[in-house]
Regions:
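Metal-dependent catalytic neighborhoods of phosphoester/phosphodiester hydrolases
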Residues: 31-40, 234-238, 273
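Pre-active-site segment of Zn-dependent metallo-hydrolases
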Residues: 1-21, 36, 122-126, 200-214
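Active-site metal-binding loops of divalent metal-dependent hydrolases
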Residues: 26, 50-51, 113-115, 195-197, ...
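Flexible, acidic/histidine-containing loops and adjacent segments that form or flank the divalent-metal
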Residues: 39-190, 280-320
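Conserved beta-strand hairpin/beta-sheet module of binuclear metal-dependent hydrolase folds
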Residues: 1-15, 175-200
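C-terminal regulatory/interaction regions
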Residues: 200, 207-212, 216, 236-258, ...
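Long, well-ordered mid-to-C-terminal structural blocks that present hydrophobic/aromatic surfaces
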Residues: 182-233
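Metallo-beta-lactamase
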Residues: 18-29, 222-226
Length: 320
């Protein structure tokens, strides 16, 4: 959160007012840092989905809960980051809106999630078991996920031919699938922000694209979901959004789009090589935030202290 404030102060002349803040999903690495932003700046609108608002609609789907109030309280406990954001917003009188499919936020259109799918994801989440039996299954699933995560950290690499893409057969979390997917057409560029969206979210968003006057394939600036994880994309979905694989790697300067991956410098596990390969297979120039922040612009002035990002090289190998 402090780094966000520092960036805003330095490059946007320290404004005291922010028009809109959008919370993509409830995970701490996305929602946690926004507390200080809401506390220290005046915010016009907060866009954030809150599971407890729908406790009355969901109560029949949770056999362990008989009281709507108890379910509402439990959902607040499960998602503490957005619960705290709500408290701050209400204290400061900031209106909170729901970023569901079809919502318009400035120049952006929300492509996913729909409300119905969001409610399904709340029920499906490993954090919200419906019964004692399902809780046991959830614990087993969580243990399995831990083992899979450890296995991914110890993953080996295989040399692969051009066009080969080895994605994980595991799915991402329900919370990641809740991610708000935003589309905008700015300065002739088609921009897609995905948060940590998984395959289900990307599929739902693609199904709504034509309503937002977005003809697929065709994205100019693609924020690769979930730090470049193999669990969030597939060959079929990338074909829908970005187009089919090319016969050869495009020459430098002739790329068809820019893929931007948010990944921490100390994160040795992301982005995954398979995902970087997939972007380049479709003509993408791939850049990451591992060596600092990244901005993309069009006909904009130079920013002091910033230099052109060096695109990632094509990985000749990928995760086994």
């Amino acid at each position: 959160g402090k780094s966000i404030l520092s960036h805003i102060d330095k490059y946007y002349e320290a404004p005291s007012f922010i028009d809109r803040v959008i919370v993509t999903h409830p995970d701490g690495d996305h929602a946690g840092g926004l507390r200080i932003v809401l506390e220290q700046l005046e915010v016009g609108e907060l866009w954030m989905n809150r599971p407890w608002l729908y406790a009355e609609e969901l109560i029949d789907r949770f056999s362990r809960f008989k009281s709507v109030d108890n379910l509402r309280s439990r959902l607040r406990e499960i998602y503490p980051n957005i619960n705290e954001l709500e408290k701050i917003a209400q204290k400061k009188g900031v209106p909170i809106y729901e970023p569901f499919q079809g919502s318009i936020i400035g120049v952006f259109t929300i492509l996913a999630p729909s409300k119905s799918r969001y409610l399904d994801l709340i029920v499906e989440s490993e954090k919200t078991p419906e019964s004692a039996k399902e809780e046991s299954a959830t614990q087993a699933s969580s243990f399995g996920s831990l083992i899979e995560s450890l296995a991914e950290k110890a993953v080996s690499f295989i040399r692969s031919f051009w066009g080969d893409e080895a994605f994980s057969d595991q799915e991402t979390s329900a919370e990641n699938e809740m991610s708000v997917i935003q589309y905008a057409y700015i300065c002739g560029k088609r921009i897609l922000l995905t948060g940590d969206a998984g395959r289900g979210a990307l599929g739902e968003a693609a199904g709504y694209a034509n309503v937002a006057n977005l003809v697929l394939p065709g994205i100019d600036r693609f924020q690769v979901p979930h730090h470049g994880s193999r669990r969030n994309v597939s060959t079929e979905l990338l074909d829908i959004w970005l187009g089919s694989k090319l016969a050869d790697k495009p020459n430098e300067g002739e790329e068809l789009f820019t893929a931007i991956i948010s990944a921490a410098k100390k994160d040795d596990d992301h982005p995954r090589k398979a995902v970087v390969r997939a972007m380049i297979h479709r003509g993408g120039k791939v850049v990451t935030t591992q060596n600092g922040g990244h901005r993309t612009g069009f006909d904009a002035p130079e920013r002091e202290g910033w230099v052109a990002a060096a695109p990632l090289e094509y990985p000749e190998e990928q995760e086994d």
